[in-house]
Amino acid sequence: MLKPLTNQGFTNKVFYDDETNRFIKIKSYDGFNHKSDAFLLNNLDFCPKIFVDNKKELQTEWINGITLNESLLTDDILKTIGKNLITLHNSKLKFYKENQIARRFNIYRKKISSLNRKIPILDKYYKKINLFLRNIDNSAPVHNDLWLFNMIKVNDKIYFTDWEYATMGDVHFDLAYFIESSNLNEKQEKVFLDAYGDDFEPKYLFIHKILVNALIVLWINAHEVLPFDDSLYLNRVEKYMEQLEKEKE
């Protein structure tokens, strides 16, 4: 019997099937999601096993564990997440290839314009953000949606879930997305990045922190009813851009 989950996402409908002990996602499409072959994820031991993936639905094994939040982020968990990510980025899995981030910026901007909304801080840095977007790499398999609520702890293992936005992309975006969406402090960020290794460029990571926060702001404002407040992410865009300008002086 299908039982609707309490925490439904913003796009799909999700259920628990108590007869098969499976997670069921009834797909809804937004133009960006469900692009990659989900069966590729069976190559990763930190992903729930995929049983069914078609245009209508996704069925995976049910992971019975603890959904992560900021209060649970021990050093060991941060290290595990870092190791999971370098494994993904070096996996050579062939996800759908596109500059999804640039396209999301473009579509969200058009939607916001149609809603007659203005975001002065993002307008102020419009040209610089566009330059950053043009230089995004798309040679590595990436998750693209690394919120803590998409991670489940089972004993010493951390499962990554909700892969619907996975594409080929830039490793720096994944790293920045996790750091920014999880609100890591400097110590936590260092623990995480040390576990990931040295296969990234700090200057590009910083630029992608700007892009991540700007993208979250755009996503929020592309909704007719704002799903949550955008001030934290707007303030970060301003702070990081000012810091970038000072470093160039």
From Swiss-Prot:
<dbReference type="Pfam" id="PF01633">
    <property type="entry name" value="Choline_kinase"/>
</dbReference>
<comment type="similarity">
    <text>Belongs to the peptidase S49 family.</text>
</comment>
<dbReference type="InterPro" id="IPR011009">
    <property type="entry name" value="Kinase-like_dom_sf"/>
</dbReference>
<protein>
    <recommendedName>
        <fullName>Protein LicA homolog</fullName>
    </recommendedName>
</protein>
